[in-house]
């Protein structure tokens, strides 16, 4: 029976995301666990177009975009020390973390 922990990190800022992945990888490597990653996932770009003027000049528009960067870390066959190390890691405020436990039978 093989267990895996999948950690998905999402952020608007790629620098804070890379810093968070480095902190998690170093914390897991201190416990001598097997880790794969960080695997960069495709970034999602959302574009919005709005009128510059509320009344006339319909052709005058402005475009904005939001870039969502994502990374994936996979920890193979974790032990309780890994879970303890992950709970002690302090990450930046702009990084969203989703942790999934996957058990293979």
UniProtKB/Swiss-Prot annotation:
SMART domains: Ribosomal_S10. InterPro entries: Ribosomal_uS10 (IPR001848), Ribosomal_uS10_dom (IPR027486), Ribosomal_uS10_dom_sf (IPR036838). One of its GO terms (biological process) is translation. Part of the 30S ribosomal subunit. NCBIfam families: PRK00596.1, rpsJ_bact. Belongs to the universal ribosomal protein uS10 family. This is Small ribosomal subunit protein uS10.
């Amino acid at each position: 029976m093989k267990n895996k922990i999948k950690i998905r990190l999402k952020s608007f800022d790629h620098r804070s995301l890379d810093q968070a992945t480095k902190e998690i990888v170093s914390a897991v490597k201190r416990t001598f666990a097997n880790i794969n990653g960080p695997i960069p996932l495709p970034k999602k770009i959302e574009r919005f177009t709005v009128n510059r003027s509320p009344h006339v000049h319909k052709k005058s528009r402005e475009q904005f975009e939001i870039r969502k960067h994502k990374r994936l870390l996979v920890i193979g066959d974790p032990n309780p020390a890994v879970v303890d190390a992950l709970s002690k890691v302090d990450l930046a405020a702009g990084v969203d973390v989703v942790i999934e436990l996957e058990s293979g039978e």
